[in-house]
């Protein structure tokens, strides 16, 4: 994965704070810091200073870091998506870099991007072996218990030759649940998409809140594995 996500730390509060700091680093085209950057810069510096102090044996002088809260995110008035990739130890907050209606592209500060169509992953860039494109179910199809469809993933193989994986998929209903994302509870419908082919099986999960995919766990590639997305701020 690109540098932006790689900079996040394994501890949850470190990951959240540094991800927020990365989000804050985006400024205008003249290089001026964004309002978000100005707001969290001092917190990030203080926290990193505390980490260095503890490493130097000065834990007694280090203050406990403040966790990233919903208020921290919402006051800037921009949509924010959280992405967690367990296989890479990555946990980051993403902002929109391109919006074409149904297809929205979210990015890190170093240009790693994730494109989702109505919340369903169709493309990645900057992650090494990328998902070049995908044929995926519509939002309506996700809610059809027992519904079936084909899902196709397109990758680049040896010598940049395109390869395709085709799965036969079935939707199933897990039920109504309440999930919490950055201190806010959401009542959602949990559905599972089970996809099979002769060489194996994958399982994608979606937590639907009306017409919004509030949370998901989606397979991206053999190397990356699954990515968990949370729509933190609309």
Question: What do the PLM-derived regions correspond to, one by one?
Answer:
Residues 2-16:
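Bacterial N-terminal signal peptides that target proteins for export
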Residues 27-130, 145-234:
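Acidic, serine/threonine-rich low-complexity disordered tracts
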Residues 23-25:
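C-terminal motif of bacterial Sec signal peptides marking the signal peptidase cleavage site
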Residues 133-142:
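Surface-exposed beta-loop interaction hotspot
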């Amino acid at each position: 994965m690109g540098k932006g996500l790689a900079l996040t730390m394994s501890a949850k509060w470190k990951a959240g704070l540094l991800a927020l700091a990365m989000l804050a680093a985006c400024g205008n085209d003249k290089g001026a810091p964004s309002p978000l950057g100005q707001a969290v810069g001092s917190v990030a510096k203080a926290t990193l200073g505390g980490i260095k102090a503890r490493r130097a044996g000065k834990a007694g002088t280090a203050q406990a870091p403040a966790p990233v809260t919903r208020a921290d995110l919402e006051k800037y008035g921009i949509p924010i998506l959280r992405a967690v990739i367990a296989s890479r130890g990555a946990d980051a907050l993403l902002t929109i870099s391109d919006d074409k209606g149904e297809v929205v592209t979210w990015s890190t500060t170093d240009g790693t991007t994730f494109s989702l169509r109505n919340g369903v992953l169709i493309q990645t860039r900057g992650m090494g072996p990328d998902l070049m494109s995908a044929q995926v179910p519509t939002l309506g199809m996700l809610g059809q218990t027992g519904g079936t469809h084909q899902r196709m993933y397109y990758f680049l193989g040896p010598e940049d030759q395109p390869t395709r994986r085709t799965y036969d998929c079935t939707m199933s209903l897990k039920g109504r649940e309440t999930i919490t994302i950055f201190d806010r509870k959401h009542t959602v419908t949990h559905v599972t998409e089970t996809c099979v082919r002769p060489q194996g099986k994958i399982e994608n999960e979606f937590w639907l809140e009306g017409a919004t995919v509030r949370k998901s766990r989606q397979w991206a590639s053999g190397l990356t594995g699954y990515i968990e997305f949370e729509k933190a701020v609309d």
